[in-house]
Regions:
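The canonical Cys-X-X-Cys-His
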Residues: 36, 42-51, 85, 101, ...
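Mature soluble domains of exported/periplasmic/lumenal proteins and thiol-rich metal-chelating peptides
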Residues: 26, 54-58, 68, 115-123
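Positively charged n-region of N-terminal signal peptides that target proteins for export
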Residues: 1-4
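Electrostatic cytochrome c docking/interface patches
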Residues: 19-41, 55
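C-terminal capping alpha-helices of c-type cytochrome domains
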Residues: 90-123
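Bacterial N-terminal signal peptides
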Residues: 6-15
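Gly/Gly-Pro-rich "capping" loops immediately C-terminal to redox-active cysteine motifs
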Residues: 33-37, 50-87
Length: 123
Protein backbone atom coordinates (compact mmCIF):
# COMPACT_ATOMS: atom_id res chain seq x y z
CA UNK A 1 0.00 0.00 0.00
CA UNK A 2 1.33 3.48 -0.82
CA UNK A 3 2.34 5.86 1.94
CA UNK A 4 -0.48 8.31 1.16
CA UNK A 5 -3.09 5.55 1.17
CA UNK A 6 -1.87 4.39 4.57
CA UNK A 7 -1.95 7.96 5.90
CA UNK A 8 -5.49 8.45 4.54
CA UNK A 9 -6.68 5.18 6.10
CA UNK A 10 -5.13 6.14 9.44
CA UNK A 11 -6.71 9.60 9.27
CA UNK A 12 -10.15 8.16 8.53
CA UNK A 13 -9.80 5.71 11.40
CA UNK A 14 -8.95 8.56 13.76
CA UNK A 15 -11.65 10.90 12.44
CA UNK A 16 -14.27 8.16 12.58
CA UNK A 17 -13.71 7.11 16.17
CA UNK A 18 -14.31 9.67 18.87
CA UNK A 19 -12.30 7.86 21.50
CA UNK A 20 -10.38 9.83 24.09
CA UNK A 21 -7.19 10.50 22.20
CA UNK A 22 -3.83 11.82 23.17
CA UNK A 23 -1.08 13.12 20.94
CA UNK A 24 0.87 9.95 21.71
CA UNK A 25 -2.06 7.76 20.68
CA UNK A 26 -1.82 9.40 17.27
CA UNK A 27 1.85 8.51 16.99
CA UNK A 28 3.52 11.67 18.27
CA UNK A 29 6.78 11.49 20.18
CA UNK A 30 6.89 13.17 23.59
CA UNK A 31 6.60 16.92 23.30
CA UNK A 32 5.79 20.18 25.04
CA UNK A 33 2.65 22.11 24.08
CA UNK A 34 4.15 25.26 25.62
CA UNK A 35 7.28 24.99 23.52
CA UNK A 36 5.16 24.01 20.50
CA UNK A 37 3.18 27.25 20.74
CA UNK A 38 6.43 29.21 20.73
CA UNK A 39 7.73 27.36 17.65
CA UNK A 40 4.35 27.66 15.88
CA UNK A 41 4.38 31.43 16.41
CA UNK A 42 8.08 31.87 15.56
CA UNK A 43 7.69 29.95 12.29
CA UNK A 44 4.67 32.15 11.45
CA UNK A 45 2.37 29.14 11.02
CA UNK A 46 -0.45 31.25 12.49
CA UNK A 47 -0.41 33.62 9.51
CA UNK A 48 -2.05 30.93 7.35
CA UNK A 49 -3.46 28.44 9.85
CA UNK A 50 -4.67 30.81 12.60
CA UNK A 51 -3.39 31.06 16.16
CA UNK A 52 -4.81 27.70 17.26
CA UNK A 53 -4.97 25.90 13.91
CA UNK A 54 -8.51 27.05 13.12
CA UNK A 55 -7.61 28.08 9.57
CA UNK A 56 -6.58 31.39 8.12
CA UNK A 57 -8.87 34.41 8.16
CA UNK A 58 -8.32 34.82 4.43
CA UNK A 59 -8.69 31.12 3.82
CA UNK A 60 -5.04 30.84 2.84
CA UNK A 61 -4.28 27.93 5.16
CA UNK A 62 -6.47 24.94 5.92
CA UNK A 63 -7.90 24.24 9.33
CA UNK A 64 -5.67 21.81 11.22
CA UNK A 65 -7.73 21.76 14.40
CA UNK A 66 -10.08 20.46 15.93
CA UNK A 67 -9.77 17.28 13.86
CA UNK A 68 -6.32 15.99 14.71
CA UNK A 69 -4.77 13.68 12.19
CA UNK A 70 -1.98 11.16 12.78
CA UNK A 71 1.42 12.58 13.62
CA UNK A 72 3.01 10.91 10.58
CA UNK A 73 0.65 12.81 8.26
CA UNK A 74 1.37 16.08 10.09
CA UNK A 75 5.15 15.58 9.88
CA UNK A 76 4.97 14.64 6.18
CA UNK A 77 2.87 17.71 5.39
CA UNK A 78 5.33 20.02 7.18
CA UNK A 79 8.41 18.45 5.58
CA UNK A 80 7.04 17.84 2.06
CA UNK A 81 3.79 19.77 1.60
CA UNK A 82 1.56 19.06 -1.35
CA UNK A 83 0.00 22.53 -1.50
CA UNK A 84 1.44 26.05 -1.62
CA UNK A 85 2.84 25.74 1.89
CA UNK A 86 6.63 26.06 1.97
CA UNK A 87 8.58 22.97 3.09
CA UNK A 88 10.26 23.10 6.49
CA UNK A 89 13.41 20.99 6.53
CA UNK A 90 14.97 19.79 9.76
CA UNK A 91 17.36 22.76 9.44
CA UNK A 92 14.40 25.10 10.06
CA UNK A 93 12.17 22.95 12.25
CA UNK A 94 13.73 20.10 14.19
CA UNK A 95 12.00 16.79 14.77
CA UNK A 96 11.48 17.88 18.38
CA UNK A 97 9.96 21.16 17.17
CA UNK A 98 7.51 19.14 15.05
CA UNK A 99 6.51 17.03 18.03
CA UNK A 100 6.12 20.13 20.19
CA UNK A 101 3.94 21.89 17.59
CA UNK A 102 1.77 18.81 17.28
CA UNK A 103 1.29 18.72 21.05
CA UNK A 104 0.40 22.43 21.00
CA UNK A 105 -2.19 21.99 18.25
CA UNK A 106 -3.58 18.91 19.95
CA UNK A 107 -3.93 20.82 23.24
CA UNK A 108 -5.89 23.77 21.84
CA UNK A 109 -9.59 24.18 22.47
CA UNK A 110 -12.05 25.40 19.85
CA UNK A 111 -13.29 28.96 20.17
CA UNK A 112 -16.90 29.34 21.31
CA UNK A 113 -19.47 30.28 18.70
CA UNK A 114 -20.91 33.79 18.94
CA UNK A 115 -24.36 32.60 20.10
CA UNK A 116 -22.72 31.03 23.17
CA UNK A 117 -21.07 34.29 24.28
CA UNK A 118 -23.51 36.24 26.48
CA UNK A 119 -22.40 39.71 25.34
CA UNK A 120 -22.83 38.75 21.68
CA UNK A 121 -26.27 37.14 21.93
CA UNK A 122 -28.04 40.43 21.21
CA UNK A 123 -26.07 41.24 18.05
Amino acid sequence: MGKWVMIAVAWLAVAGGAVAQTAQSLGAPAGSAERGKKVYMEQLCYTCHGTVGQGGDRGSGPKIYPNPFPYAAFATQVRKPRQVMPPYSDKHVSDQDLADMYHYLFSTKPSPVAKDIPLLKNF
